[in-house]
Amino acid sequence: ERGDTNRDFSLGKNKRYVLGINFGPYKTQEYYNNIHNMLSNVEDVCFRDKYSYNLFKDLPNVRQAADIVFSMDMSNIKNTNRKRAIISIISPKDKINKKYKKQYEEKMLELISFLIVKGYEICLMSFCKIEHDEEEIEEIYSKIPENQKKKVEKYYYNGNIEEALNTIADSQLVVGGRFHANIIGLCLGKSILPVLYSDKTLHVLQDMQIDTPIIDIRNLESFDIKSITDDDLTRHYDVEKQKEDAQRHFEKLDLQLKKT
């Protein structure tokens, strides 16, 4: 919302398609009105969650389908069952508020220790350098006890999507601080443990009726790591329906491309 203006995406005679998006969180009616006006001027809008769709369903050009990443072809990715947990780390000061930083780091360190005791190897994964994921990983890693560090490695995404997907595929569990860490984990048949900094991940999990413990950065004091069961760490979900539904994001665009 910061610095928002009443944007216009109509851009002359060119048709515009806005696919795979969510809306929120938002604070002001003015911001909502600006986005509503902007979306009313594009050819097609396809949201990834029902919460966002319901906010704009009065517009005739608005649709909803499963998250667009479910449509990715991952058939060439080497999936393993290595007892490893991918932990997608975020920087609280960039994604939510710096006041959560200390408590977030303490909870991640507790989780790392908890998983190592259960026999997991750990990979701390950065999805976004510009939002300081890597800096946060270095801070957390520096606080891991020396006798546990041999079980922990780091992976920094550098634009090589296939390499990143293979890294995630070489695991059993994805602890998703980044929204799409959870979605990719589900696509690859992994168990997931979401870490929320806003409700956008929650909205999609609710749409999918996924029942898993959720670590909410905004309410860390109420989450007991020891409450996570072995069943929680090994639960799997059938997402074939979502993989098929996600293809619908492109249906209007495909029609347009066939005309040109």
Regions found by a protein language model. Name each.
Residues E1-T260:
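Active-site anion-handling motifs in enzyme catalytic cores
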